[in-house]
Each structure stands twice: as C-alpha cells, then as structure tokens.
C-alpha cells in the first residue's frame, strides 16, 4: 500500500458517501494530480497514486467494508493494483463544470443530516488482543428524543412546513458567470435546511429532537487486533435528524505491553535463559507460549543467541485463518560463583579439551564466558 492515511480524507468525502460521490471526488482529484498534466511537479505522481489507492478501496464494496471495520489492517497488498489506473478514463465536460461551480448546480437538496461518528479508545491486555474478547463500555451520545420521537415538537403538535423554502430546505437564486446566468440553490436560513419550523418545541429536548444519554454498549473484539486497529460499530454513533441514520462508533484499540512477549506483525518474540551446560549437552526445557508452557528440546551444542521457531504459536491473523509464529531466543547464563568441586570438574574438562590453564592466562571461567558471549 502506498499510504496509511485515511482514505475518506484523501478523497475529501464523508464516511457515508455513496459511490456516486466517491467516483466524482476521485475523478476531480485524479484530473488535478495526473502526472501527464503535472510533469513539472515531482510530487504529483505520488499524490495521484494515493488518490487512486483510496478510490480502489472505497469503490469496491467488499474492500470498503473491510476498511470500515478494521482500517488499514483489513486491507492486503493484493487488494490494490496501481496498474489498473493507467487505463482509467478521466474526462467529460461535467467534470470541468464542477471545478467552476462546485458541482450540484442546484440538483441536490440537503435533506436530514445523518448523525456524527464517535470514537472510543480502548486499552486491552495482550492476550485479549491475541484471542479476542467481549467488553462492555459506556459512552455519552445524543439519541432520538423519546418524548417527541425526534420531531422536536411538543406531543400533540407537529412541525410546520417552512414558508420560505416550502419544505425543500433550500432556496433558489441566480448567478451571473462568464458562461452566462445560472440558477443555483443555498440552504434556507429560515429553517436551517430542515424544511420545517417548530412553533411549540418539545419540553424534553427543547426542539432539537435529540437528548444526551449514557449508553452501555457491548463490543466484540476479534482475535488478532493490534494497537491502532479501528473497529466500526454501525449506527452506534450520534443520532441523526429524524429520517436520517445514526453515525457510527469507532473503537480504537491500544494493546498493553506483555511481560514476556514482544509482538511484530503477527509474530511474537521472547527470550529464555539456559545454563552453559544445557547449551553444551542439550536438554528438554519448558518455554512460554500464549496458551501456557510447552516442552521444547534444546539440541546439544546450541550457541548463545540462537533463535528457535515455533510455528503457528503467534497471533491469529485478523482477516483470515492461521496464526503467526513464536520465536524463542536462548540466552546462555554463566554462573557467577562456583564451589571447588565444580571448578575442579571444569579444569578436568579443560585438560581433556587441550586448554592449558595457568595463573598468567585468563581464567578458564572467563574463557567459558567469552566463548558463550556473556560478560
């Protein structure tokens, strides 16, 4: 992937934008930053790739759904192919027209506003990120007023049609341009674009149609999430105007560090201490995994800092089957103090090995430490 930026921000569209809006934004930006048009701008090509990548994901319903649910973690490298865009067409007089007049030309009415999106940052333990969990949270948000059912009017009364815009929410006006006179629209300042006026407001919400509440929500966290993963909960955001959908709730994950393991992508890493005798002779030891301790055989002659791999003992993949691996690095520990018997055995070992020991030479223990790369 060429970018880690928010695809919606790149195209300048909202998260509930339809395919027509997404395509229109893409064509406008692609025309603006196309490398053939901006040959003197060294940054144009990268900008064009960024725009194309955003459109490639957001124009595909399946890819867009995965991106909305998991963010960039839900998108694989093979989901994007920049070469496809070399053949895409840009053009049409309507695109140039949009650049002069901002699009729309009065064809679109505002309508009820959807609710705003919310974000909630959640810190979870390492193990919960690996295997998934369910959490209950409480968030403050606006909800539809139960007293007036979102109309904003006092029970027993109804909102009235705005006399200035006749319920359209917009008023029409004309504008003279170098191309002639054009009719355009703007939001009605009498009703604020709602198309209705409330003479007798609801006593609970004071006419807004919404109230502030503390809402308990159950969040299902899938296995494999990591710090920065974004989980989308549709329609759990702020309430929209009557007739419009709620916004979405985005759970931003932060994973707590682990005492033993470090994570890189879906692999985990840890360090296990062994004695120099175990390294030399080999041994069967217990090593930690996410599921608990397991038996592992250290082969004889193992060198310091050797890394062993346990397949499928890492983090489950977020968007598919299988898991990462666990990598175990052995740290050879040399004893700081030994009794006379232990020292004598090592001296005999040195003699058999052909190592000459005398006071003028560095001690055999120091040799062992040097051999195993420890101080």
Curated annotation (Swiss-Prot):
A zinc finger (CR-type) spans 132-214. It is found in: Cytoplasm. InterPro entries: DnaJ, DnaJ_C, DnaJ_domain, DnaJ_domain_CS, HSP40/DnaJ_pept-bd, HSP_DnaJ_Cys-rich_dom, HSP_DnaJ_Cys-rich_dom_sf, J_dom_sf. Zn(2+) 2 binds at residues 162, 165, 188, 191. Residues 6-71 form the J domain. Zn(2+) 1 binds at residues 145, 148, 202, 205. CXXCXGXG motif repeats lie at residues 145-152, 162-169, 188-195, 202-209. Transmembrane segments: none annotated. Keywords: Chaperone, Cytoplasm, DNA replication, Metal-binding, Repeat, Stress response, Zinc, Zinc-finger. GO terms for molecular function: ATP binding; heat shock protein binding; unfolded protein binding; zinc ion binding. Residues 222-243 are annotated as: Disordered. Its main location: cytoplasm. One of its GO terms (cellular component) is cytoplasm. NCBIfam families: DnaJ_bact, PRK10767.1. Homodimer. The J domain is necessary and sufficient to stimulate DnaK ATPase activity. Zinc center 1 plays an important role in the autonomous, DnaK-independent chaperone activity of DnaJ. Zinc center 2 is essential for interaction with DnaK and for DnaJ activity. Belongs to the DnaJ family. This is Chaperone protein DnaJ. It comes from Halothermothrix orenii (strain H 168 / OCM 544 / DSM 9562). The gene is dnaJ.
